[in-house]
């Protein structure tokens, strides 16, 4: 089985998943009480105006026609019009999605930078105090609600210590950098604006640490498990018998092989971070997709909520596709195994 045949299979799978998400979101949107045409027109609109809007949206057509039109629009990049703002949902997502991605990427980077070394040390010093501490941290991270942890760090670092800002992406008196990528850190660097860069970095620390804490423990446990498996292999004992230094064996022999089975977990963590950002952004008043969709839910903005579900699901499946291809590139035996 070649790389391109596997890529073709994964892409078909991606299309099927997105189609399935469209089916689910369409069904849910029609089960929820409420009239989108009435919500869009307003409470004081006449029945004639509401009926005109219903005809424009195609809500007076049979359900199968509405569904076919909805799926066709989704695959053309048209997610409908937001009831709350009157703007296309895709335009709204282009505004808020970069903020969520910046938070998710920074959180994943923190989880990897801290979690991988902890996992290595936990495996090397198995059943010692650091190993027990890492396992306790993993259990604590998984079981601690993100909103509770976020409120805790705000009270500590913003309320008592006054070390870091408690919300937002920038101080109110600063103008955002010129939009290039939508990531304030990168855009500020491209603009050469150090003041905006460091201010954006300060605002990013608390929410990214909060979001990274759960996945930090997961990454550490995954690396620990894979490292313990590799350290018990025959080639490690052979390397030790050859007189190679212990940490050289750990970092140059065991770690690369331990990272291979960890790629899936590390990649899918990014997809989880997109979902986890909803509560975190709400707590920290972070102007991303999470805070936007919470406001849309409160306003019964069905097109916005459905668009959020489709885009995040697509991003999650796309990350899964990249992980599968990366896994195949790192270990080509997977493709040969599938062919056999």
Question: Model regions: which residues?
Answer:
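Residue-level signal for discrete positions within transmembrane alpha-helices
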Residues: 96, 100, 136-143, 152, ...
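Alpha-helical membrane-inserting segments
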Residues: 24, 28, 118, 122, ...
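Hydrophobic alpha-helical transmembrane segments of membrane transport/permease proteins
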Residues: 17-68, 157-196
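A hydrophobic, multi-pass inner-membrane permease signature
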Residues: 141-149, 193, 200
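An internal, D/E-rich "acidic patch" concept
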Residues: 3, 60-116
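N-terminal signal-anchor/first transmembrane alpha helix
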Residues: 1-60, 90, 94, 121, ...
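Alpha-helical transmembrane segments of integral membrane proteins
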Residues: 2-6, 97-130, 176-340
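Residue-level recognition of pore/gate-forming positions within transmembrane alpha-helices
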Residues: 14, 22, 44, 112, ...
